[in-house]
């Protein structure tokens, strides 16, 4: 990288962060009343600090509404909330329980009705947060969770989608989520040792018992999706998808469109990279999931800053923030896409919730697509072990 390019990288990242903070601060002031629950308890600290004074029985009141989209036949808010970061996935350890319960309720107040968690997040802790937070409004929200990993001594182990394990996982999730049914149950990762047809039959039985309403797959290949759908119609498929990872467009999107299946992208802001939250010289703590991801290694990170600069330029053009632009771009790809950005901070929640209001025209999308095709990206999206769990059949 030339000195000039390095200087441009160094200058642009703080500028993006300043702009993001400025816009978020404005949103926080304008929506200050939204931080209060119906009882007057603080829902989440706008400065992003954990709070512990919000009573767990506070009933949230929905003050904002988002447009809705359909995942198959399941109607949800046009954006969901991913609840993985709350357990310390990106470092810092699990967040304060009351603060996260408050944050989830604040998301509902912002119009979000679609919440994504998993048995293995924590493990179990994320489901507990979601269950406690949404119990007062259970009939007004859609809760998605996942099975597919063994959990021993509080730690995830190997892939496990055996029928008996699925049933045990679902019973545990129902208890932690404080509900009698799961709206959307995903297989977290396809298990090469269990035919997907056996998995589908097991979930079909759970649906017949009323414990599950819809089902989906995560990081599944087009072939696996078709096999699963032939046994039990699939409602949604989840995968990583963002400006820097567009592989699902090649084989997954055509399959989903043909079969009428929705798509739920996780990490739609590239693990906060497109939010301007990462700088070229940043080094990640060993507790931060990004510390061993190829695209976040020093050399790759520095070279990939050109993508952030691109998002920043478009954010200025659209009078929005880079993260809102990134989310709006994801949503503009198909009408059956519902991203689930995660956060642990109220200002970021407010910022994310504004993305559905950002409109990109067809001509703008073509212009963006042409530009992205010319941006070289360095490093894979996952470490070798995680990569081995993705279904590529």
Predicted segments, located by residue:
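N-terminal secretory signal peptides
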Residues: 1-17
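N-terminal twin-arginine translocation
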Residues: 15-21, 31-52
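Terminal-tail/helix-coil boundary detector
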Residues: 22-23, 45-66, 258, 286-313, ...
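Conserved, mostly hydrophobic/aromatic
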Residues: 71, 81, 115, 130, ...
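N-terminal small/glycine-rich loop or linker at the start of catalytic domains
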Residues: 72-90, 144-157
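Glycine-rich, proline-tolerant flexible connector loops at the mouths of alpha/beta enzymes
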Residues: 117-132
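Glycine/proline-rich, positively charged
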Residues: 152-247, 251, 261-262
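Aromatic-lined glycan-binding groove of carbohydrate-active enzymes
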Residues: 248-283
């Amino acid at each position: 990288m030339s000195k000039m390019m390095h200087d441009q990288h160094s200058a642009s990242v703080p500028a993006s962060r300043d702009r993001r903070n400025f816009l978020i601060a404005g949103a926080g002031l304008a929506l200050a009343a939204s931080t209060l629950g119906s009882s007057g308890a603080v829902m989440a600290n706008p400065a992003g600090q954990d709070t512990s004074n919000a009573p767990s029985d506070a009933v949230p009141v929905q003050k904002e509404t988002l447009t809705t989209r359909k995942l198959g036949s399941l109607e949800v808010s046009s954006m969901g909330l991913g609840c993985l970061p709350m357990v310390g996935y990106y470092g810092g350890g699990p967040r304060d329980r009351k603060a996260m319960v408050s944050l989830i309720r604040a998301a509902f107040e912002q119009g979000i009705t679609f919440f994504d968690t998993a048995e293995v997040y924590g493990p179990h802790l994320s489901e507990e947060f979601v269950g406690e937070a949404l119990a007062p409004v259970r009939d007004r929200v859609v809760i998605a969770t996942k099975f597919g990993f063994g959990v021993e001594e509080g730690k995830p182990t190997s892939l496990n989608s055996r029928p008996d394990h699925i049933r045990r996982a679902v019973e545990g999730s129902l208890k932690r989520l404080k509900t009698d049914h799961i709206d959307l149950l995903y297989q977290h990762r396809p298990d090469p040792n269990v035919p997907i047809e056996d998995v589908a039959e097991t979930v079909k039985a759970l649906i017949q018992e009323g414990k599950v309403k819809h089902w989906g797959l995560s990081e599944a290949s087009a072939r696996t999706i078709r096999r699963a759908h032939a046994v039990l119609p699939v409602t949604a498929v989840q995968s990583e998808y963002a400006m820097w990872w567009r592989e699902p467009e090649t084989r997954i999107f055509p399959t989903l469109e043909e079969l009428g299946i929705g798509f739920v992208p996780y990490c739609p802001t590239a693990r906060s990279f497109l939010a301007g939250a990462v700088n070229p010289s940043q080094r990640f703590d060993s507790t931060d999931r990004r510390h061993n991801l190829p695209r976040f290694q020093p050399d790759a990170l520095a070279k990939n800053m050109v993508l952030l600069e691109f998002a920043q330029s478009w954010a200025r053009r659209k009078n929005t923030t880079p993260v809102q632009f990134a989310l709006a771009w994801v949503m503009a790809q198909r009408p059956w896409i519902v991203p689930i950005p995660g956060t642990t901070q109220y200002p970021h929640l407010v910022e994310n919730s504004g993305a559905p209001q950002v409109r990109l025209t067809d001509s703008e999308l073509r212009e963006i697509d042409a530009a992205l095709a010319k941006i070289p990206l360095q490093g894979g999206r996952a470490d070798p072990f995680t990569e081995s769990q993705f279904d590529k059949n």
